[in-house]
Amino acid sequence: MTQRPLGGSREPPLGSRIVKRKFDPAELELMDRPQPVSPELEQDLRSIRQLNRWFGSHRIVRCFVRRWIKPGVRMRIVDLATGSGDIPRLIVDHARQIGARVEIVALDQQSATLEIGRKLSSDYPEISFIEADILEFKPPDGYDIVLCSLALHHFSDEDAVRVLWRCRELAHKFVLVSDLCRGWLATIGVNVLTALIFRAPMTRFDARLSAERAFSFAELDDLARRGGWQNFCHKKFRFVRQAIWLEKTAKL
C-alpha cells in the first residue's frame, strides 16, 4: 500500500533497537489498579489529557479523522482504552464543525476513570461510555472506525497481538493504533518531563513505566503481522510516537 505523507517517516527512531522492553504482568500502572475516584486519579487523567494535546496523540488522531470523516457522513466509532474520553470529544468536535454525524463508544475497564470521563463529556451525547475489557468486548455489530491510542504497551506481546486482532475484526472501514515508540529518546524525554513538569507521583510512575513497556518500531510491525494485519501502513511521528493503520482499500 502506498504511504501517504502525514508528517512522519518510516525509519525507526535512534536507539529503539538498543533499549530492551521491560514488561512484568504483575506490575500494573497505578491508573490501571482498582480504585475509586480520587484527586490523585483526576490529576493523573488531567496530565494525560495535557500530554495527549501537547505531545502528539491528538495530532495523530486529527490527521486521520480529517481524512476519514467527511461532511455529511454518518459513522460509528469505538475508542478502545479511552481513559477520560478526550479523543472521542476531539472527534465529536471535528464532526460537529463539518456537519458529520458520529456515534462513539468510549470503552475502558477502569470504572473510576469512566466516571470521570462521563462527567467531562456531559455536553457530548454522541459519546457512550462502556466498562469492558478490550479482549472480552463483543458488540453485536462492528464499527466504521476503531481507535486504540496509548494502550498497547499495557499488554504482553501475546495479548497485544490479540488486541490488534480484535481491532481488525471490529472495523468495517478503518483502524488506527498509536502508541509510544520505545528508545532512548522516549526514556530521556519522559524522565525530564516527569521531573520538571508532570511531577505528580501517579503520573511520574506510570509515564516512566510506559516508556519501558512501549514497543519498538520493529516490534509493533511484527505484532501487527502476527495479528493478521495485511497491507497496513506504519510510521513514526513527532515526540517518539508511532502509528499503524488500515484503510478500506486494504484487506481487513
Question: What residue spans do the PLM features occupy?
Answer:
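N-terminal, positively charged/glycine-rich alpha-helical extensions of SAM-dependent methyltransferases
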Residues: P13-R46
